[in-house]
């Protein structure tokens, strides 16, 4: 009672998105009014997510008797059900960057992609329980997620929204998780347990392996290269590349580049990149920002 269930931030950072008492609210960071978007006392509305374009909010609700994915305008109004699932428990709606689809997983180990027109695609079904670790590519055409293998390790899979193709990004020989696409769509970063340097405890004389996790990347295509390779900075003569010699410093700097993710499945596992030397730590997750991890 009186507890905030979960929360998020609007794309502009000006309002908070909060679920509490079974309803969905938006709250101003500084000035304005608090809006109760759903205003229902007969349902449990939860796990709300703001679309990247800021126009809609997705949430999960049991108002129909079973949990479904709903969307509502960010200013309020009538909500709309996008799904017609049976008896399922749904979790973690994640918008595509293009704001045209929502990924969600259920308690049966399945990932679904729900388009705004109501089309639902089952991406993957795991026999080992819920898949909670999934991320969209910046072009909204690919998704990366972690599955459990027969050996009990985590392995990363890639799914093409256009073709439905599944690609094995890591084979499960080493535990891998927390996939995150680079902003330019050329690399897939992830965490993996690949180095084991056990230490002896000072008092109990037991071996402890606590620094096995490192940050790695896969070059998604043959042209992606290694972003952490040796650099060779050169001086560019004035006038090269642009009439005023400021191609990257003037108007072009603010233009958004179109990202088109290309995945070459052949040899993907061989294009493995160690992000930072001696970076083994107890790392739990790997979120990606525009130009940083």
Question: Can you name each region flagged by the protein language model?
Answer:
Residues 136-137, 141-154, 287-293:
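Loop/turn-rich, solvent-exposed surfaces of beta-rich toroidal or solenoidal domains
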Residues 10-17, 22-25, 265-293:
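Long hydrophobic segments that form regular secondary structure
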Residues 1-3, 28-46, 61, 72-91, ...:
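Multi-bladed beta-propeller domains
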Residues 11-12, 52-53, 97-98, 138-139, ...:
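Residue-level detector of Asp-centered blade-edge/turn motifs that repeat once per structural unit
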Residues 8, 49, 94, 135, ...:
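Conserved beta-strand position repeated across blades of beta-propeller domains
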Residues 16, 57, 99-102, 140-143, ...:
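Hydrophobic beta-strand positions that form the internal "hydrophobic ladder"
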Residues 19-20, 64, 106:
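Structural signature of WD-repeat beta-propellers
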Residues 25, 66-70, 110-112, 152-156, ...:
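Structural motif
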């Amino acid at each position: 009672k009186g507890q905030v269930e979960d929360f998020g931030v609007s794309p502009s950072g000006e309002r908070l998105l909060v679920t509490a008492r079974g309803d969905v609210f938006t709250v101003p960071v500084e000035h304005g009014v608090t809006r109760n978007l759903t205003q229902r006392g007969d349902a449990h509305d939860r796990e709300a997510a703001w679309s990247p374009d800021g126009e809609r909010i997705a949430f999960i609700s049991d108002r129909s008797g079973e949990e479904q994915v709903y969307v509502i305008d960010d200013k309020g109004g009538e909500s709309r059900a996008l799904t017609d699932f049976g008896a399922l428990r749904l979790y973690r709606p994640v918008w595509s960057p293009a704001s045209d689809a929502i990924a969600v997983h259920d308690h049966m180990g399945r990932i679904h992609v729900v388009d705004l027109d109501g089309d639902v695609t089952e991406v993957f079904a795991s026999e080992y329980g819920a898949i909670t670790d999934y991320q969209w590519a910046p072009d909204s055409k690919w998704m990366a997620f972690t599955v459990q293998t027969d050996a009990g390790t985590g392995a990363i899979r890639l799914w093409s929204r256009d073709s439905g193709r599944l690609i094995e990004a890591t084979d499960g020989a080493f535990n891998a998780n927390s996939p995150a696409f680079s902003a330019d769509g050329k690399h897939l970063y992830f965490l993996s347990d690949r180095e084991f340097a056990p230490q002896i405890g000072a008092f109990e004389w037991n071996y402890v392996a606590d620094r096995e996790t490192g940050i790695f990347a896969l070059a998604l295509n043959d042209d992606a290269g290694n972003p952490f390779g040796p650099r060779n900075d050169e001086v560019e003569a004035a006038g090269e590349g642009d009439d005023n010699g400021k191609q990257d410093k003037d108007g072009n700097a603010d233009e958004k580049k179109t990202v088109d993710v290309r995945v070459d499945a052949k040899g993907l596992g061989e294009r493995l990149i160690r992000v930072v030397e001696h970076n083994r730590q107890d790392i739990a997750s790997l979120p990606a920002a525009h130009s940083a991890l």
